Amino acid sequence: MEMQSYYAKLLGELNEQRKRDFFCDCSIIVEGRIFKAHRNILFANSGYFRALLIHYIQDSGRHSTASLDIVTSDAFSIILDFLYSGKLDLCGENVIEVMSAASYLQMNDVVNFCKTYIRSSLDICRKMEKEAAVAAAVAAAAAAAAAAAAAAAHQVDSESPSSGREGTSCGTKSLVSSPAEGEKSVECLRESPCGDCGDCHPLELVVRDSLGGGSADSNLSTPPKRIEPKVEFDADEVEVDVGEQLQQYAAPLNLAHVEEALPSGQAVDLAYSNYHVKQFLEALLRNSAAPSKDDADHHFSRSLEGRPEGAGVAMSSMMDVQADWYGEDSGDVLVVPIKLHKCPFCPYTAKQKGILKRHIRSHTGERPYPCETCGKRFTRQEHLRSHALSVHRSNRPIICKGCRRTFTSHLSQGLRRFGLCDSCTCVTDTPDDDDDLMPINLSLVEASSESQEKSDTDNDWPIYVESGEENDPAGDDSDDKPQIQPNLSDRETLT
């Protein structure tokens, strides 16, 4: 069996110990104020303190002190009271500070509770404002109806008996129309925060006036339809008000019906300065009978032909709305938005996937292009090409250091940097006895060739032939071999 009162009693005892500073082994400094607490309570409820106290597990005897710079002292005091009592003291003034402090201390339960509190508070305020607006609208409608009734009665009393019937009919019409106007004002207050009906529905008023100026047959056959702007509903109020909205509002009138209902030569006076009208135009373009952009432009040009010259601002606003819907216009061609490829490591974006792949190599360190001669790797192929042309000089002939011959193509990897051809790296001495083969010491060859290089004007090694003429192989052999043989004989006598 569980005792529900045990938890509250245990928390109460711990809170009493904290207030009396009994067995408190932790201190938190916030904005100069010192708060005493127990490590176990902080460790069990806060992820921030859990990560902070994990370093002091072995040093259980030491007194821990933490300093918080981001959290306010009032918010931390409320959170600390919640840890020891389970009660969170929230109000409209401190809920934001408490929620930010709980988020910093990694207390998800407190954050979710604050969000719920904010949502419920906003719902209550919204309902109160809505009820007040409806009550004010009903009172205004009742006052208008009473004033209209008084005016009608006064008109009936002042007129002659012969025209009394006409006055009575007119008064009846005014009485019938005044409640409709009251309902209209109530709907305007519900739909938008502004109370001016003229700013909320400019299209509706103009269409009604134009339809009222037509023939009586058209008024009887085609009743005026209402144009309602796009209204953004709150997610919590949609389920409650959707039935009422569907019953009260008629179907929205598209642009083609407006043009058919208007008489020829009369233009629609559009007020584009209102934000709700812009939303309505976006919805109108989305649901219009014109299937393409050209048809929509044709409809708008027809409806705006009779506008005065002083309506330049309204025209510019219309083009802004149209550009937002269709995208950028370049003459008669519609420019399709370009898809940008985003780097997963930084904010860099590229128009082509290959460019982004090359950019990602700067983050990963990948170098997929190695040099065949020296083994150095590069991120781009053109860098490898320039490296091969500038460093290894593959197109220039090189004079061998041993035999003084020029060589370009008959090379193995890495021999170009030593300046020796293949024949000089494999030179051997062939005495009378073919069975005993002694390899040539290349260090002696280099020592003998150094004396010849000192007399040369060019001291760079390896030596490159700039003129492109190759030396005579026969002449080089006749000059160099007699010098190599004495050195070898001296070496043999020394050993």
From Swiss-Prot:
PROSITE patterns: BTB (PS50097), ZINC_FINGER_C2H2_1 (PS00028), ZINC_FINGER_C2H2_2 (PS50157). Its main location: nucleus. Residues 24-92 form the BTB domain. SMART domains: BTB, ZnF_C2H2. Keywords: DNA-binding, Metal-binding, Nucleus, Repeat, Transcription, Transcription regulation, Zinc, Zinc-finger. One of its GO terms (cellular component) is chromatin. A zinc finger (C2H2-type) spans 341-363, 369-392. The keyword DNA damage does not apply. GO terms for biological process: regulation of transcription by RNA polymerase II. Residues 157-178, 446-495 are annotated as: Disordered. This is Zinc finger and BTB domain-containing protein 8B. It comes from Homo sapiens. The gene is ZBTB8B.
